[in-house]
Amino acid sequence: MIDFSNTEYLQHINYLRSKPKHLLRDIGDQWRTPDALFLAINELYGPLVLDLFSDGQNNKCPHFYTESDNALAQDWAQKLQEIGGGGAFANPPYSRAKKHKGSYITGMSYIMKHTIAQREKGGRYVFLVKVATSEEWWPGEKADHIAFIRGRIPFDLPAWFSPANKRQEVTTASFGIAVMIFDKTWTGSPISYLSRDVLLNRGMELMNELKEPQTLVIAA
């Protein structure tokens, strides 16, 4: 069993977290999924119970992998079976491909390769990805469904980010995004389109419902 708790990739992330102040370029692949967006996607394609790429602070699901687990070394399908149902969510890192002791820990091509292998074993894998149809990693028809989101999506700063100066004081970064579904039991169309505004508005409604006292009592 390879120990992934001290890779160069994780060392660099921990270094950034430890800095008292940051530049926007420090964020790299650490932009966070907005809660409202996740809740809307979860309602459409969930329940999503396993966050595949988390830093331990930004996880959207009750079960999650962190960088020290290396999601690319894990059996996602088996984990979902152990959890007892539901699907997995991913806002994957876009770092260049890196290895640790012969095993890939980053790289979208390798993430997609592992995802397709896990799909064959069973389970649903819901990815939030940048629209990059010309990139080598773009899976195309290997994804069972691709929902293109009309309108750019604002992503949140990581929890550890502290701006070094006024020029670094932004709250979001916007990207063209698609939702990819990897699930060999999918019976819907291969392509669809979603509205950013409808998604985010529905997500905000769900967030407000979660804050209502009666909802919290039921959940308890």
Predicted regions and their residues:
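Class I S-adenosyl-L-methionine-dependent methyltransferase catalytic core
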Residues: 2-220
